[in-house]
């Protein structure tokens, strides 16, 4: 038995519509200023839209980074700021870098969707940023929809606890483009007014762009906030709609609190996803009640920053860190009248309250949920000794490549189909599956879905006993190209929600979770090449943390050709 490692947050910074660093952003929030403004038709949308964009003077700071994309410039500025305030060198072997984003450099796809710029690949974005800081191959990219930032913090915490790294910088970022705004407009989820989370008037979200960075370390002092717990779950309900019960988010909150040894009465406040869409906020209110946290103050920061996608979990955690340190709970800007069926404590005004612990949550497309616990060091629970690593073994493998599906090394299905689309339909039919929704999925989802049909045949687990960890190189680029071509040819108004929902790679995990009722951990990593050993190492950590009996792990990649490797453990 080993002594557990405490993970401290020792530095942070954020760039948003409200300012160039944490101090400026905190000042703006204290003054009840929102970064959400009206943008006329043109740069980010074909129509007038309310959004929170980074101001021109911010980009001036990056003028010497002209060979990097706009998003890469933000990442570099944020990481530089962290390094300038810490004794850390990303070239050191015990230092890691994790980037969280939903769409990365997707704005580059607009001009040449038929021949994508290599920088559109998330792994290439990661490589370029890593090269700038001489971080070598110690960079990871997580694209897990709107929980990406919180997921990245959890992954960083676990790598430090495992001894892989002593310090990790987690940086989350996304910028706005026609690609993103057209998709959300197609879902009719964007409000024509400034969003008002949890309010009876709420009718949608506002999008935003930002980049934030946090330094996590195995060493800290008595003023550094501790990342004391974290967990990820899935609704196993719907790929674009939140759970109607809130149970998936509740599972993540419960596990995060258990890891932190925190009870409901210990929690000072919650910072929730709070997008101001009707169904998200309703779901969160139910999860809060399931977790017994209905008497804990709740707030959302979306009416200040907008929904900043892959940056949101990082930048909102930064604000929570400073709320804990300064004994202030910021109000939910614009909140007036309760608008969710399960009563929760939301208010518009800032207030001073005694602080101990904060719970930060996030939810996203694909049914994913995440929760972390942030703790003042004086209230850190005395952790018990950690368990030794769990013993796992591979019980089955499935691979799909070159119109051939094999299981445990033996071919079980092959086809002379002229293309992947026809092959995968035939492979699915061969399982005896009858889910008509299969035929509406994009090809990446069909690939993963079919592989797991074979993998889990005659195997049964309870929803919280099994998780899924996937990796690929192309993310959702096949469907990204399709969405971009639609709006290029017909305009933003032609964007289809049934296409846009599949422009997130983790949705393949969401489809699998729905089919097999998987509500355990689910995370999607982006890598140029599959590192099976590293994924297995992380799967062991996940299984121990979540008390899982099984975890599907593998490579699920589709770009002109299909390659899928999945393993059940």
What are these regions (language model features)?
Residues 149:
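Short conserved active-site loop signatures built around small residues
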Residues 1-139, 144, 158-161, 177, ...:
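Conserved "HGTGT" condensation-loop signature of ketosynthase/thiolase-family condensing enzymes
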């Amino acid at each position: 038995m080993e002594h557990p490692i405490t993970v401290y947050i020792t530095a942070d910074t954020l760039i948003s519509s409200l300012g160039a660093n944490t101090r400026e952003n905190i000042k703006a929030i204290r003054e009840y200023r929102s970064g959400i403004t009206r943008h006329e038709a043109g740069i980010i949308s074909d129509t007038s839209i309310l959004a929170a964009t980074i101001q021109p003077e911010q980009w001036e700071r990056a003028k010497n980074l002209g060979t990097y994309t706009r998003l890469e410039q933000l990442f570099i500025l944020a990481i530089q700021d962290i390094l300038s305030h810490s004794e850390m060198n990303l070239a050191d072997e015990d230092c890691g870098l994790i980037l969280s984003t939903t769409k990365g450099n997707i704005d580059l796809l607009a001009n040449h969707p038929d021949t994508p710029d290599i920088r559109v690949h998330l792994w290439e974005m990661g490589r370029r940023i890593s090269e700038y800081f001489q971080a070598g191959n110690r960079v990871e990219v997580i694209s897990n929809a709107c929980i990406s930032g919180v997921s990245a913090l959890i992954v960083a915490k676990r790598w430090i606890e495992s001894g892989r790294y002593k310090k990790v910088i987690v940086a989350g970022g996304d910028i706005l483009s026609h690609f993103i705004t057209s998709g959300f407009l197609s879902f009719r989820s964007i409000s024509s007014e400034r969003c008002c989370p949890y309010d009876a008037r709420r009718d949608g979200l506002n999008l935003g762009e930002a980049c934030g960075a946090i330094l996590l370390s195995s060493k800290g002092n008595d003023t550094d906030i501790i990342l004391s717990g974290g967990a990820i779950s899935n609704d196993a309900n719907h790929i674009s709609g939140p759970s109607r019960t809130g149970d998936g988010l509740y599972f993540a909150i419960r596990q995060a609190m258990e890891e932190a040894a925190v009870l409901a009465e210990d929690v000072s406040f919650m910072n929730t996803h709070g997008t101001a869409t009707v169904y998200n906020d309703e779901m969160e209110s139910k999860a809060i009640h399931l977790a017994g946290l209905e008497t804990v103050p709740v707030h959302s920061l979306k009416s200040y920053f907008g929904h900043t996608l892959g940056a949101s979990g990082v930048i909102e955690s930064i604000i929570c860190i400073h709320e804990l340190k300064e004994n202030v709970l910021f109000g939910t800007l614009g909140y007036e009248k309760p608008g969710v069926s399960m009563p929760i404590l939301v208010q518009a005004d800032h207030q001073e309250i005694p602080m101990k612990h904060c719970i930060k949550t996030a939810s996203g497309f694909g049914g994913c949920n995440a929760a972390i616990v942030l703790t003042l060091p004086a209230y850190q629970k005395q952790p018990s000794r950690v368990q030794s690593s769990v013993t796992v073994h591979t019980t089955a493998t499935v691979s799909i490549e070159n119109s051939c599906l094999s299981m445990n090394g033996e071919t079980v299905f092959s086809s002379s189909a002229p293309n992947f689309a026809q092959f995968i339909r035939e492979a699915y039919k061969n399982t005896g599956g009858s889910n008509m929704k299969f035929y509406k999925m994009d090809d990446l989802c069909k690939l993963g879905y079919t592989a797991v049909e074979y993998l889990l045949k005659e195997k049964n687990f309870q929803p919280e006993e099994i998780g899924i960890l996937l990796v690929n190189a192309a993310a959702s680029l096949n469907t990204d190209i399709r969405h971009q071509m639609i709006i290029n040819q017909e305009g933003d108004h032609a964007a289809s929600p049934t296409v846009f929902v599949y422009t997130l790679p983790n949705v393949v995990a969401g489809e699998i979770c729905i089919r097999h009722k998987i509500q355990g951990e689910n995370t999607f990593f982006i890598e140029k090449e599959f590192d099976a050993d590293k994924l297995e190492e992380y799967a062991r950590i996940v299984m121990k943390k979540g008390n899982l009996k099984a975890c599907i792990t593998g490579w699920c990649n589709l770009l002109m050709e299909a390659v899928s490797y999945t393993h059940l453990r």
